[in-house]
Swiss-Prot record:
GO terms for cellular component: fungal-type vacuole; Golgi trans cisterna; peroxisome; plasma membrane. This is Oligopeptide transporter 2. The gene is OPT2. Residues 1-167, 211-240, 294-334, 396-404, 502-553, 604-614, 693-730, 790-811 are cytoplasmic. Pfam families: OPT. It comes from Saccharomyces cerevisiae (strain ATCC 204508 / S288c). Residues 189, 262-272, 356-374, 426-480, 575-582, 636-671, 752-766, 833-877 are extracellular. Keywords: Glycoprotein, Membrane, Peptide transport, Protein transport, Transmembrane, Transmembrane helix, Transport. GO terms for molecular function: oligopeptide transmembrane transporter activity.
């Protein structure tokens, strides 16, 4: 064995496999080591390497199969002194405190190693401890402390790799036009299908490789500048990711199509294309402005993990990454293997054997038993079933291969509590809900029929009190009641929890914004804002931020200009067109997003979970603008899409940060794509309205019944025409108490976490209530139970006991299955479902037979004395 480790020696000693001792100075040693990175036995003892791999979780790796990330960490380790390493670990203990995504045993090991600095003499530090101190510090300094990041992200960058090329733009624009049009067209169908980002990544890879090989390297001169339609280089990883991110920005919700559909088809308001374009332009771009503010909180910091972006990076690495020879199948082969497996398998649950989709086997025992169907049914019941589905479309509903296990488990526990509350609400017959099915998302009348909102509106699409009094108030199923209650709880919970737990971060953020706005009084501040040498990353020292310092950052004023420009366009729309929408309503939406954006985006960046502000905007504006459904819809579009588009854009910024895509190139490209997307989506939408017979009607032959638009319309009537005052004060008074319940939960857990002696490390009340919110009709426990099993296997068992396999294949598996599923669904739709060629046999009909398939209420409305429940006609609130 080697001698005692000496202080201030970069790598104090090297024990070869023969036992001879060698010493080296840092730079020379690092160069020699980089030339032999595949044979670390020349520079470290076998025991040291195996010991460190075990510390990182690689239980089954050998010296002949060292993971790429470990090899890189060991390669960079000579650049750190022992003092440097101690400082890095001490800073990391503070920075990553309470970070659930850092393995607990790893964090405790950091603390143990840092405590060794207090020894009287550094010579008393054990050889292995000294090695671990440098190795862990090297992982943090030169790579990442997160296993998820090390699995798919390359720590180094080559700035000479082409990114913003003509071919990358051309392919991105073509596929964005195809994808946006396709997704818009089929988004209004009952069973919608879409071209998601993974499938487009595969198409981009095929097209990019073909372009590089077949298109001549000609140049085009524009205003004296030459542009090559092809370059004499292979299709690169950065071009692939750049094109992917341009497509990804148009995968966010094109929210204004709900406004246009409801106003044209349900409110019969003939607004011009100019109105549609300007409204869409304002709504789609206003979120970009907020994204610039969010960068320093959820893009640049290393703690902003963004687990949901890992599959996108994994596909890129699998398709174009250079893999070193390792045991087992390559990522490239594994991706296409999983793609073909899922492409074939998806035919069975989707078309051939539907019981694989909805495996409600317990209801088959007695199909007519309503109670059994209510509790265990997967169609209209709560889905309490340990083996509920074998369909990857259902299993992957909540991304079990992507969300951290602690995040998925917390959400699942929230789902279980929500199911128990639904049972309590239903079987206690709260507000006579037993006269309705237990778990549906429809609105009902007091006679148990579907609530038709047109029955209570006048010719101006406002509430007609006489019609309302002769018809019925709207009633919710028990499942919808609990879902709405959880949604209401989430808002005050988010505020109280965040301002207690993240008080310093939020205080500094709001202080920074206030000071910047106040500084705008001076000319010097405006000059500084327009400087070209914007250095936003100077305060960050992780490897990815350091690599990104090679590229110019997008100045704040670019985002500020888009925010102001979009707001001006929005004001012009609501003022010029007959929308009945006050300008101050836009500023209220901006204010709510200003308060909620940082907490909600931090939640998404660290846990993968997100929720929107749509219900909050509906309720607040319903109080402020009673009887004005058009205004509610417009303000809801702004209030929701600011958050939605900002989150979408900053997640793309984080991918660019990980993959070293120049920020200014991404900004330019995504602005161009969003502008094009507006024309494509509006063109497709207006064509559908004009050319598809019975479009958005319940009996449309091709099932283009617009379920989302109908829900949007119903919500505009309930919260806009009827109003939250009637709902909260009379029909469902429990809702108003949910605000207080949410605030109390946030205060209780916030105080406990910040000042309590012990707090469960992996418990986040926002995720728990978010899980309750997930349990929203028609998505019952069936959509989460099978995923819970997969999450345990992947994110817990495999990650803990087979980390080498998990790192190499987990996100590739997620991407391969997702890609195969989407392409298979498209083929199935056009081959058999579009022609309505049903495959009728027992395996396809039994899930929908009996009480679970129909959704019977527990009580029959005809058994009541008056033939209705609740308030008497003429006395409705």
């Amino acid at each position: 064995m080697s001698e005692t480790v000496k202080d201030k020696v970069i790598i104090d000693e090297k024990v070869s496999t023969k036992g001879t001792v060698d010493y080296a100075e840092g730079a020379e040693y690092s160069e020699r080591l980089s030339n032999h990175s595949s044979d670390f036995s020349q520079w470290y003892t076998d025991e040291q390497i195996l010991h460190f791999m075990k510390k990182l979780g690689y239980e089954n790796r050998t010296l002949y199969d060292i993971p790429e990330d470990v090899a890189y960490i060991l390669k960079k380790m000579p650049e750190l002194t022992l003092e440097d390493s101690f400082k890095i670990l001490k800073d990391s203990i503070i920075y990553f405190k309470d970070d659930e995504n850092i393995p607990h045993d790893q964090y405790e090991e950091w603390k143990r190693l840092v405590d060794l600095e207090d020894l009287d003499s550094k010579e008393g530090i054990d050889e292995y401890d000294s090695f671990d101190i440098r190795a862990f510090a090297s992982a943090i300094k030169f790579h990442s402390p997160y296993q998820e990041v090390r699995a798919v992200v390359d720590p180094e960058d080559d700035p000479t790799i082409p990114v913003e090329t003509f071919r990358a733009y051309f392919l991105a624009i073509i596929w964005s036009v195809i994808g946006s049009g396709f997704n818009e067209f089929f988004s209004h169908r009952v069973v919608s299908i879409s071209l998601n980002t993974p499938i487009i990544q595969m198409f981009l890879y095929i097209c990019g490789k073909a372009w590089a090989k077949t298109i001549p390297c000609w140049t085009i001169t524009i205003r004296g500048r030459k542009y090559g339609i092809n370059i004499d280089k292979p299709w690169t990883q950065k071009e692939q990711m750049f094109s992917t991110l341009l497509y990804a920005i148009c995968q966010g919700a094109f929210y204004t199509h709900y406004n246009i559909l409801t106003q044209k088809l349900f409110y019969h308001s003939a607004f011009s294309f100019g109105y549609q374009f300007l409204l869409s332009l304002s709504v789609q771009f206003i979120g970009f402005g907020f994204a610039g503010i969010l960068r320093k909180f959820v893009v640049y910091p290393a703690r902003a993990l963004w687990p949901t972006v890992m599959p996108t990076i994994a596909i890129n690495k699998a398709l174009l990454g250079k893999e070193k020879h390792e045991s087992g199948m390559s990522r490239y082969k594994f991706f296409f293997l999983t793609f073909f497996i899922m492409f074939i398998y998806n035919w069975f649950p989707t078309y051939i054997i539907n019981i694989l989709n909805t495996f409600n086997w317990m209801t088959w025992i007695k199909p007519s038993n309503i109670n059994l169907a209510n509790i265990t049914g997967g169609v209209t019941g709560l889905g309490i079933n340990p083996i509920s589905s074998f369909d990857w479309n259902v299993i992957s509903f909540n991304s079990p291969l992507v969300y951290p296990f602690w995040s998925y488990l917390t959400q699942y526990l929230g789902c279980i509590l929500a199911a128990l509350i639904v049972i309590a609400v239903y079987y206690s017959n709260y507000m006579s809900c037993q006269y309705l099915p237990i778990f549906t998302n429809s609105l009902y009348t007091n006679t148990g029929h579907s609530f038709k909102v047109t029955e209570v509106l006048d010719s101006d699409n406002k509430l007609d009190v006489k019609k309302y009094q002769s018809y019925s108030p709207p009633y919710y199923s028990a499942g919808n009641l609990v879902s709405y209650g959880a949604f209401i709880c989430a808002y005050p919970l988010m505020i109280t929890w965040s301002f207690i737990v993240h008080s310093k971060l939020l205080f500094n953020a709001f202080k920074d914004w206030a000071l910047n706005l106040w500084a705008m009084r001076k000319l010097k501040s405006w000059v500084t804002m327009f400087k070209s040498d914007y250095r936003a990353l100077d305060d960050y020292d992780d490897p990815h931020s350091n690599a990104m310092k090679n590229y110019k950052e997008v100045p704040d004023w670019w985002y500020f200009a888009i925010l102001i420009g979009s707001l001006v366009v929005g004001i012009a729309v609501v003022e010029h067109y007959p929308t009945n929408t006050p300008v101050w309503g836009l500023f209220v939406c901006l204010g709510f997003n200003f308060v909620f954006l940082i907490p909600t985006t931090i939640l998404q960046a660290t846990t993968g979970y997100s929720f929107g502000l749509n219900l909050l905007i509906e309720m607040v504006m319903g109080y402020a603008l009673p009887g004005n459904p058009i205004a509610i819809m417009i303000l809801k579009a702004f209030g929701y899409n600011i958050d939605g588009q900002a989150d979408n854009y900053v997640s793309n910024l984080k991918i660019a940060h990980y993959c070293k895509i120049p920020p200014m190139a991404l900004f330019r490209g995504q602005c161009v794509i969003v502008f094009i997307q507006i024309f494509v989506n509006l063109g497709v939408l207006n064509w559908q309205i004009s050319n598809i017979k019975d479009f958005c009607t319940p009996h449309q032959n091709a099932k283009f019944t617009c379920p989302d638009a109908v829900t949007y319309y119903n919500a505009s009537v309930v919260w806009g025409a009827i109003g939250p005052k009637r709902i909260f004060n009379y029909i469902y008074p429990i809702f108003k108490w949910c605000w207080l319940i949410g605030a109390c939960i946030g205060i209780f857990f916030g105080v406990w976490k910040r000042w309590g002696k012990f707090y469960p490390r992996y418990f986040d009340p926002m995720l728990f209530v978010g899980g309750m919110l997930n349990m929203s009709p028609p998505y019952n426990l069936m959509y989460y139970t099978s995923g819970m099993i997969v999450s345990y296997i992947s994110q817990y068992y495999m990650k803990r006991h087979h980390l080498n396999l998990w790192e190499k294949y987990n996100y590739v598996l997620s991407a391969g299955f997702s890609t195969g599923l989407v392409l298979s669904a498209i083929i199935i739709f056009f081959a058999v479902q579009y022609k309505d060629t049903a495959f009728n046999w027992w395996g396809n009909t039994v899930p929908y037979a009996g009480a679970d398939g129909v959704g019977y209420p527990l009580k029959n409305i005809t058994d009541t004395a008056n033939g209705y429940f609740g308030y008497a006609p003429g006395h409705y609130p």
